[in-house]
């Protein structure tokens, strides 16, 4: 089963992201295809994507997440600045003010999961929340002109109280996430 470890963003940040998406949509042709918006209610901060794992591995994963969570105190992170990956943009996202504690949390999870036999993250952690994925070159060029107008946007703060393990199922209508476990920070 496709599995990932994430932080929930909370209702306020999700609502603000939904408003931001609507603002950006206002600059695009309403009939525009070639862009897939992420449902704000499904938006999360991914700490580690594990990919396909066997069901008998879930207990080990959740044990690592539980042990890691108990070593960290609750903290907050700011969600701000719209940006993108790719030229023209292929993924539009809003950034996370990556704090030392968030980096240590992600690094500790990655290290412990790597020791348990999962693949290490090769890329440096870039905390972000995906707003949309772009499939069409022309839409990407349009977004490239629009994004700078939203660089000062702030969606508020995520109050990090727990770490979650999710199962992800890809469907024709989009991904469906099932919470497998949640562990409170100390």
Question: Language model features by range: what are they?
Answer:
Residues 1-186:
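Histidine-dependent nucleotide/RNA phosphoesterase domain, centered on the 2H-phosphoesterase fold
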